């Protein structure tokens, strides 16, 4: 049953500050906010003492693998997992088969997402060359990329020599274009038997050189480009100097090659986990406010035994909200900035002024979290047999409810049942 009028009462993060308020949503939009509204509703949620309502997260970088003939995953399976973690909006990357590199394949993928996704999926158009970039811009794609500058899983590299022509099709008021900043010429294609060998194959200079070259192109061709999953504080510094936005992943902030078993294939990912000093430098950049967004780079793979045989990529879109709140609780990031990294900042980059805040006139997408530590369990998200590095990890801020328009989900019950459980209105 749809709850056309939802009334939320309790502690709510509004404008970056925690306030005792009531929020009324009607037909999927926030229509009133006040200390006491005296309004009737189809469903009223009164928050508990340790519960806090925040804008529902936006994950700027996921791979749902749909369409793709070789994966048993897709929009249905992956967006259900995101929903179980309280996420309401994701941007899906284009390394699929077929890739959305023409208006036709782009529209087909959008339709596939509309038919199967449990939450909103923003489809990113695939960049192959300047012609397809031009066609996708004309077709209305407002996100392009991830543009791979080095070969990765299911993603051939876009030759560096073609980038100036691609940049000519971009503009300061054009689509957000997301880049994977590793340079193919500096990446080795040798087999790797452990994380150390994988790291050696994809060294830091492959990233910093790519970032520097992209910064030069940005100066020459003004555009809205964004660097995803950067792993080095030097990369952040170069990007900031060129007014380029960046995101980092939870796995690059929480793990390094010294904190995990180097032969564990779960942690094989591109770009690779770095050393401890790189990870701590990246955390310092986050605390300084130099990193714009926290994004998961959710990339599902079935877990295999042999390190060499395992594709690169990990899942984690389900825990993007607890990851942000853990940065607040344990690493000194303010609550305002921690939540902004997964809400209003990605919304601004996407040009979506209907998302990212609890405010009148915004979409009613709000997640309720219990502000306490909890243990992440892979089985609660259907991640038992996949590359999920967060199993057993203690995090802060357990998602317990999700308001997504006219639907209100009980997330704890949903995780228990393994499917969305909608709260009934009166």
UniProtKB/Swiss-Prot annotation:
Species of the source: Methanopyrus kandleri (strain AV19 / DSM 6324 / JCM 9639 / NBRC 100938)
Keyword flag Transcription regulation: no
Binding-site residues, substrate: 63-65, 95, 301
Uppermost EC category: hydrolase
Family annotation (InterPro entries): Amidohydro-rel, DHOase, DHOase/Allantoinase_Hydrolase, Metal-dep_hydrolase_composite, Metal_Hydrolase
Cofactor stoichiometry and binding remark: Binds 2 Zn(2+) ions per subunit.
Family classification: Belongs to the metallo-dependent hydrolases superfamily. DHOase family. Class I DHOase subfamily.
One GO MF term attached to the UniProt entry: allantoinase activity
Protein's UniProt name: Dihydroorotase
CDD domains linked to this entry: DHOase_IIb
GO BP, sorted A to Z: 'de novo' UMP biosynthetic process; purine nucleobase catabolic process
Cofactor(s) listed: Zn(2+)
Location of the active site: 297
Its biological purpose: Catalyzes the reversible cyclization of carbamoyl aspartate to dihydroorotate.
Binding of Zn(2+) 1, residues: 61, 63, 146, 297
HAMAP family (UniProt xref): PyrC_classI_A
One Pfam family cited in the UniProt record for this chain: Amidohydro_1
Pathway: Pyrimidine metabolism; UMP biosynthesis via de novo pathway; (S)-dihydroorotate from bicarbonate: step 3/3
Catalytic activity field: (S)-dihydroorotate + H2O = N-carbamoyl-L-aspartate + H(+)
The EC number(s) this enzyme carries: 3.5.2.3
Keyword flag Disulfide bond: no
Superkingdom: Archaea
Keyword tags: Hydrolase, Metal-binding, Pyrimidine biosynthesis, Zinc
PANTHER family: ALLANTOINASE (PTHR43668:SF2)
